Each structure stands twice: as C-alpha cells, then as structure tokens.
Amino acid sequence: MNGKLLAVYKQFLDARTKISSNCQLAPYDWYSLPDKLSRLWIGYCKMLSEYSRELANSINELGRYIINLEAWKSVIKNIDDEDDKYEVIIEFVNPFATLAINLPYVIRSRYIYSVAHLCHQANMTKQKKWIDNLPIDEEIWFQDTDKYSNSWRGYKKLKPALEKISNKKYQSATYDFRNKYNHRYSPKIELGMTELVKRKVGNDGKVSYIIGQTNPLKLIQLLPILEEQHANCLKAFEKFQNLVNEHISVISQVY
C-alpha cells in the first residue's frame, strides 16, 4: 500500500471511531431448549444453533459494512482530486458497498432456508404421520417455506417482515444492483456510468437501441437505503425468535 493510500486509510479508521451508529446488533444465545430431549430432536437443535448464529452474523455483518461506508463517505468528500478519489473508491469503498448491497438478498434467502428446515422439523409435534419430504436444500424457495410453516402462528408475523427485505422497492432504489452485478454490469459506486447503450424489444417485436446511462450510486443516497434494510432484517429476526420460541414451547410439552 503506497503512502497516500495508507494515510487515507488512517483517516478512515479515525472517522469510524467517531461514528455513532444506529445499527443495533442481532443477539446471540437467546433461546433455551429443555435439558432433556429425545434423540429425535438432535437435528432441530443442531440446525437452530447454526441458523440462529449465522443469521445474526449476517445481519451484524451488514451493520459493520454500513458503519464502514459511513466512515468512507466522510473521508472521500474531502478528496478533491478525482483520480485520487477514484483510486480510494476502487481500493476501499467498492468492496464494502458491493457486499453490503448484496447482503439483504442473502439474508432473506437464509431466512427462507432456515425457517423451512426448522418448521419442517417442528411439524413432528403436529403431524402423527410426519413425512420427511422437504425439498433438497438447493430447491427450497419461499413457497416451500410457506407450505411447511403456515401452521405456526409466529410464521404469519414473520412472513410480512421477510417480504420487506430485498423487495422491489429496494431493488429499484439500488438500480437493480444485485441482479445486474451477478448477471450483467452493475451501477458504479460514487463515480462512473454504466449501460451507455440499452437494447429494447417492443411489444410488436421491433428492436431499438437507446443511448443513455445509469448514474452511479452515491453513498449519501445508498446509506439510508441500507440502514432501512438492516432495520428490516432486525425486525425479521425478532419475529424469527418468536417463531422459534413457539416451536420450543410445543416441543417441551410433547417431548
């Protein structure tokens, strides 16, 4: 790392210590399983241990990236030379921004996967002829989570919370960054333009080419969007906790 970048990174570290973050942490070790359970529940217990921890890790990771981007926002606004600013953005800002923008979709998907598995296991308390017919991991979608979770009161409150994570509003506000990043060319962060030419096919099949651009995502506009998503993820975690506690309450009575 050259001297100029090192000096800028020190500014970032200093700026980060001064940030008063609104990003609360998702909790750990919040549930209590019965001391004695049948071996039948080993799968549920192991899944719950991993899923609750990793969901919290993912949400807290998003919170850290938001804090880092907030600090970088205060640093780059004081860099006047555009070439120097671009170098800092490429080196430090882009990695955090790219991960942060993608994380809400990741977290939503992990919720869907985790809830489907946990509710499927917990359904053993409700179904006398329980069948282990959950789809394979690679094919668990939201509709599958609905199917295996809809008999639980907690899920009825969790589902609308999940629907606010990485939703169409977020997709539009970030210029469809996640989809374009993985399949085409995503918007730039702070500086630069993409999609200078767009191919359009009309309803009549007529093809046209449109000259234009997609402007960069500025941190000043991106950070409130990410903070809202982080809050949505935390709200969903609260509902997830309620669902799990509902599971545990029933499991404790039956087994």
Where is each model-derived feature located?
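Helix-loop junctions and short alpha-helical segments
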Residues: Y65-E70, I76, D84-P104, R108-A161, ...
